[in-house]
UniProtKB/Swiss-Prot annotation:
Organism of origin: Clostridium perfringens (strain SM101 / Type A)
Pfam families reported for this sequence: RadC, UPF0758_N
Keyword set, alphabetical order: Hydrolase, Metal-binding, Metalloprotease, Protease, Zinc
GO MF annotations, alphabetized: metal ion binding; metallopeptidase activity
PANTHER family: DNA REPAIR PROTEIN RADC, UPF0758 PROTEIN YEES-RELATED
Location of the motif JAMM motif: 176-189
UniProt cross-references to CDD domains, sorted A to Z: MPN_DUF2466
Species lineage: Bacteria, Bacillati, Bacillota, Clostridia, Eubacteriales
Record-given protein name: UPF0758 protein CPR_2111
Length: 227
């Protein structure tokens, strides 16, 4: 048996490349698209089977885009070459999304939610994201600032405003998730917001809003008159 089962060894009607050319990329499954990137399987599985195992081992596409080289290479059938192919693909997508951000203007909380809801709502730990805006409320950048249990003693305004100054932001919005799915603000959430609001006034970089993301829903502290 060949050490690496290639795409052209899969029955012609099941080959991802041929399906893409004939039907279009939108007709392929996630596993088939990844198979085209990886090109070969291994001695135990063809490339489509390997792609299926990779995607499902990391918890779907969201997990794939967050996986490190070490985590990928711990999967059966994934060595350095395939791990770097996956990481390069993910990085290209991330850069594309960043280039899209600069076209977005924020006028209401739902505009912000569109940027972060899918990313944050399914996470198992709290993550704080900073959105930097220019003088016209257009997005300059979106950055993950903190990961872990959020409380007012751990989230330091210095880390947030350092990134805002670096990007020449005129104003900022922060967002974080509640893994419980309930976006009701905690006392720590309110304390963090108050501290950042006061620091923003001193630095001339206004905190416009703080969004808390739950399970497919969100709360804006601005709309709740907490900010």
């Amino acid at each position: 048996m060949s050490e690496n089962i290639k795409i052209n060894e899969i029955p012609s009607g099941e080959r991802p490349r041929e399906k893409l050319l004939f039907y279009g990329a939108q007709c392929l499954s996630n596993e088939e698209l990844l198979a085209i990137i990886l090109r070969t399987g291994n001695k135990d599985s063809n490339v489509v089977e390997l792609s299926y195992r990779i995607i499902h081992s990391v918890g779907g596409l969201n997990g794939l885009f967050k996986a490190s080289a070490k985590e990928l290479m711990e999967l059966k059938g994934v060595k350095e070459a395939k791990a770097t192919q996956i990481l390069a693909m993910c990085e290209l997508y991330k850069r594309f999304k960043v280039s899209e951000l600069t076209q977005i203007k924020i006028s209401k909380p739902s505009d912000v939610a569109k940027l972060v809801l899918d990313e944050l709502r399914m996470l198992r730990q709290e993550v704080l994201i900073l959105i930097n805006l220019d003088t016209k409320n257009k997005v300059i950048s979106k950055k993950e600032i903190f990961k872990g249990g959020l409380n007012s003693s751990l989230v330091h305004p210095r880390e947030i405003f350092k990134e805002a100054v670096k990007d020449s932001a005129a104003s900022i919005i922060i967002c974080h998730n509640h893994p419980s799915g309930d976006p009701t603000p905690s006392r720590d959430d309110i304390n963090i917001t108050t501290r950042l609001k006061e620091c923003g006034k001193m630095m001339g970089i206004e905190l416009l809003d703080h969004l808390i993301i739950g399970d497919n829903r969100f709360i804006s502290l601005k709309e709740k008159d907490i900010l």
